[in-house]
Amino acid sequence: MTPYRDVPPVSSRTHSSNRDRSQSRSRMSHESGSSVSTTSIVFDRISERVAAGDLSEKQPRGDDNEDALKDEPDNDDLETGPFLGNASGNGNSPRHAQKKGPGMDRGMRRALLIAAGLLVSAWVAGLFVYIATKSYKPASATAHDPQATIVRGSGKAVTLDQVMGSFWRPEVRSIQWIAGPEGEDGLLLERDAAGKDYLVVEDIRSQDAAAVDSSADAQAADARTLMEKGSFEYGKRVYNAVKVAPSRDLQRVLVATDVKSNWRHSSYAAYWIFDVKTQTADPLVPGEPDARIQLAQWNPTGDAVAFTRDNNLYLRKVGSDNIIQVTKDGGSEVFNGVPDWVYEEEVFSGSSATWWSEDGDYIAFLRTNETGVPEFPIDYFLKRPSGTEPKPGEEAYPETRKIKYPKAGAHNPVVELKFYDVVRGDVFSVDISGGFADDDRLITEVVWAGKQILVKETNRVSDVMRVVLVDVAARSGKTVRTTDVKAIDGGWFEITHQTKHIPADPSKGREHDGYIDLIIHGDGNHLAYFTPLDNPDPVMLTSGDWEVVDSPYAVDLDKNVVYFMATKESSIQRHVYQVKLTGEDLTAVSDTSSEGYYAASFSIGGGYALLTYQGPGIPWQKVISTPSNPRKYEHTVEENKDLADNAKKHELPIKIYGTINVDGVELNYVERRPAHFDASKKYPVLFQQYSGPGSQTVNKKFTVDFQSYVAAGLGYICVTVDGRGTGYIGRKNRVIVRGNLGQWEAHDQIAAAKIWAKKKYIDETRLAIWGWSFGGFNALKTLEQDAGETFRYGMAVAPVTDWRFYDSIYTERYMLTPQANGHGYDTSAIYNTTALGQNVRFLLMHGLADDNVHFQSSLTLLDKLNLAGVENYDVHVFPDSDHSIYFHNANRIVYDKLTNWLINAFNGEWIKVASPKPNGKRRAA
């Protein structure tokens, strides 16, 4: 589900800015002794009790409505104790009666004091011996061990302030690889680097001369400055660069300033053509420096720019002030070269629907007609997205933005691929027989292959896909491949944007043009090489009981080598591999001798790669020469030393990975335990999940997030299980959810909870589940399906509650249309309010300006609860917040609310308020 990408992954987001390393001054009370050993705390307590004349009985325990963070004298585990509450979870244990016993005589008191003194002296002596023999090792001297199953030490506790800020985020460098003017490989853009001009083209090998293999011809290219400063003057104003894109010949830079966000990926900006030689800029639209441009792109040869303004496509050639208007029908309901809301969100995951041909002679662009798409209003009560001031007298009214939003079963936008011949100056389309009707067509990917172009189309419900090959010069085309996914496994076609054109080169053994695509093969997705372009029978480059992910990454055309990422070692790991175009010699690029979760970014020619290790250990990054490159190079660009130091000094949760068997299917899980986990205790459990189709939450990344805080900071156990429907456990386990979202996803969470409830260290009366977006939907569906039998509590943020309310392209892929699957929509909705009423309590939160999962979902559920008289829930709404819930400190409030609500749940507070009664007697009116 697209909402998955918007779920704020607290503290797992990457960034390149300097981290705020300051510690929070408002530390929780239970942290105050974190730097002192447990042993010393025990002796301090003995001394306190001796001084108080009390060694015979435990201190009374307060009611659950006392400070949840208050230390409990009868529990020496400072991390878990304050948060465990009553083992029964009912919040009604009485205060122990305090009986005043007979006084202790002075002789006995003196003897006890002497004995305590001797014990303390012996302990101090033992401590000196311990240190002298180097047996003692402070927490700050122990490196983070992701494989640890037990933590002993007295490091600092993980706090919510830390996970909400940047304290636990790895520093991640990004490299913008570019092609050299003469075809050089290994060139990159450096932007705003310390001690350098603002925008510089460098050879990666110049970053570390010592890393270059001196035995090879490895001379680095000279650095070249494109922009000396990040700002420039035009007229009487200074403009600051926000986005930059150099031309292929590096003579000019396309610069965006004054960028204003539109939807998730799209924005408006003023665009400029910056001249490298003169260091001056001119507006992309001559004479209009403040023109609001939606998209601008260089052509591959660097002598023209295509751009979209007011939903019309334009062209400007370098050296000319003449603007060519390619289309004239753009407006509020017709888009040219940019996607509408649903295509931006669900198909392209980006703001561009413009594709230049490799020689710059043609532009392919998507024309989207929204005329028949219904509008959905979004009200803004505090901000004005339009940027305009209200009319006099209308200041007290909200601004309403109407979005063309196709819900399940409603009219979809009509899309068609158009072409512009730059030389002839005309727009044309190519009709190909056997295609889908206008109301039954999605265009999901467009890839140029020389003078020809590959187009992927599917039917509306995404279970039949065809690949069309268009000869643009001849203005003709044909269907070269059709896949009936429904017939294969009953599932759906998964959109990808990684298809790679492989040009013909007889000298390299490639007689014809071809392309590499990710296709269904066996029970997963694998790489296939189709050559010639119209050949429907591929050479399989990969196969096996594993899957290729978001690939191919890159292709070295000189060596006929393909680089890709896959789950070959484990479904919760990611490694980088290479394979020849013949399907032979599949070998690993990353180190597979140990567990790892890698990502990679390859240079244009595939000779170099930025290899990013994301876990389970402390993340690091290296730039390496690829195996096909004879010039050996390796340079570490990020070690995350500060993060490693933080991990040493803090008590991170213990992560236990494994699988559980549910109905014969092995499901991945990760259990996060408190650092000082004690199997003799009874812990409450929070289940966190997303559960959306094809998603994965259990993985081997290094992450210290909200779930980590729940375990390490609150002392609860936090479990994540990827149930059926999620990714990388085989397509048969993925597509089983089609037609009835929520049935198997909720079933598997309940089955997992029953497994944990039987564990000796789990308090089965205190189980909760939470999620955001699809995870919020599944949290509610789980509570509904379980009806209080296993789970007692739930927290849902921005949930879908009826799939009729969500967008058509996403929903119908998994549910078909409401017209064809009405019963499935009925049963997948959150409808059984009686079952929800059998839980102790649940929490619902939503942003009022959510353009993705509309507030309509939560309002409809609230209406159902009202009609049924169900009141065991709390609601919090966030004005003007979209799906990510950030406006006006909202994101922090979300996690504060989750934290405090969960503490109250596990302390039994919600049981107390279930049947409120007045204190004392009141006289009837």
Curated annotation (Swiss-Prot):
It catalyses: Release of an N-terminal dipeptide, Xaa-Yaa-|-Zaa-, from a polypeptide, preferentially when Yaa is Pro, provided Zaa is neither Pro nor hydroxyproline. GO terms for molecular function: aminopeptidase activity; dipeptidyl-peptidase activity; serine-type peptidase activity. Its EC number is 3.4.14.5. It is an enzyme of class 3 (hydrolase). It comes from the Eukaryota. It is a single-pass type II membrane protein. Glycans are attached at residues 369, 832. Gene3D superfamilies: alpha/beta hydrolase, Dipeptidylpeptidase IV, N-terminal domain. This is Probable dipeptidyl-aminopeptidase B. It comes from Chaetomium globosum (strain ATCC 6205 / CBS 148.51 / DSM 1962 / NBRC 6347 / NRRL 1970). The gene is DAPB.
